[in-house]
Amino acid sequence: MKRSVAVWLLVGLSLGVPQFGKGDICDPNPCENGGICLPGLADGSFSCECPDGFTDPNCSSVVEVASDEEEPTSAGPCTPNPCHNGGTCEISEAYRGDTFIGYVCKCPRGFNGIHCQHNINECEVEPCKNGGICTDLVANYSCECPGEFMGRNCQYKCSGPLGIEGGIISNQQITASSTHRALFGLQKWYPYYARLNKKGLINAWTAAENDRWPWIQINLQRKMRVTGVITQGAKRIGSPEYIKSYKIAYSNDGKTWAMYKVKGTNEDMVFRGNIDNNTPYANSFTPPTKAQYVRLYPQVCRRHCTLRMELLGCELSGCSEPLGMKSGHIQDYQITASSIFRTLNMDMFTWEPRKARLDKQGKVNAWTSGHNDQSQWLQVDLLVPTKVTGIITQGAKDFGHVQFVGSYKLAYSNDGEHWTVYQDEKQRKDKVFQGNFDNDTHRKNVIDPPIYARHIRILPWSWYGRNTLRSELLGCTEEE
């Protein structure tokens, strides 16, 4: 802090300052407004080192500077404003130690100090989560997030499967440069077989032998944040085949493509692939990419270029992670229903609401309502108000009989008693969501605008066989 130094040699009462006896001339401090007393060389002499804005022998007057040409004049303690960085000066009977100063500075966010002169280092409190790197800025901070996280504080996870394995991404959305045909054309290894963990005799995509620059392409149908990819090989005629390395390209229109680069360079990134035909191998994109179309270009293959895969990422909002139906984070007691069904009226075949978890396995692996009508519901208590941005549904089989919900409505509540049915904003009526077409394929619906609520109800509106449901909610608990 700059200080003006007024040096005055005081002898006796000649300048109106009491004569001090022997001892410390600066005790008590004769300097006002936070001035620092400095003993002089001669007995009874001292000087006052005054803070900015104060003058006179004992720092008792405030300096007002109207312009470079005008002489300083005395004014109130807030003129000129002693507060830095946009701080607001307020007249106050304030003390700094034992000294009356007459004002306080109200500092804007990001600054502190008596005169708001210090920039706060927000990174000291480690605001960046999940391995994010914090950079302190002037009155602010920024977080550089790992590829699979996003948000101001890297608080949103963005690494969920985008739907190749589960079937949210349809066959028509998966295309390729070529298809391998074997056994006189009877076996066709189409691109839409390239689904992670797919089973069967023909369970992957294989490029044609004469395809010198093969690729497989995923159309996500809208721009999404893509943070990684999982690859897997397969066996063809008993022989392991897989992709050892590959490149990634992306596009927003399917025509103009950009290759994913090594960070900070213009060099195409070559990703490590698989080392056998069955073990999945994941690569993350740091930084992630935002695109509607993603292409994978095999570089080195074992025998033929054979692939099963999944893309990882989330909606652009970043708030579209599974809330815990499949993982079990949502516990059994949080899932209730209007009624339940028992096959053959036997307790061991009870289709309880707690079984309504996406991809649940077993003979009894879903919720089925006791009645087939439009008054049935499956309810999830999220325990706290939560932003819900999507839902995935799935049917099931009861002793070989295919059952699923073909369409449904959604309702939400914060107290579990008063419910609101989600509306179609354009048509201004209850929104009916498209459900499933079979018992096993995932069907995802985006909830836009999102729901903010603690309790969510799925209201079956049409069904095949019986109201049978496995499900997952997508969203996040919002944090600053």
Curated annotation (Swiss-Prot):
GO-annotated biological processes: cell adhesion
Xref: SMART domains: EGF, EGF_CA, FA58C
SUPFAM superfamilies membership: EGF/Laminin, Galactose-binding domain-like
Subcellular locations according to the entry: Secreted
Any one GO CC term of the record: plasma membrane
Keywords, comma-separated and alphabetical: Cell adhesion, Developmental protein, Disulfide bond, EGF-like domain, Repeat, Secreted, Signal
The F5/8 type C domain, residue ranges: 158-314, 319-476
GO molecular function: calcium ion binding; signaling receptor activity
Span of the annotated motif Cell attachment site: 96-98
Domain EGF-like: 24-60, 74-117, 119-155
Primary localization: secreted
Disulfide bonds: C26-C37, C31-C48, C50-C59, C78-C89, C83-C105, C107-C116, C123-C134, C128-C143, C145-C154, C158-C314, C301-C305, C319-C476
CDD domains the record matches: EGF_CA, FA58C
Signal sequence residues: 1-23
Protein name as catalogued: EGF-like repeat and discoidin I-like domain-containing protein 3
Gene coding for it: EDIL3
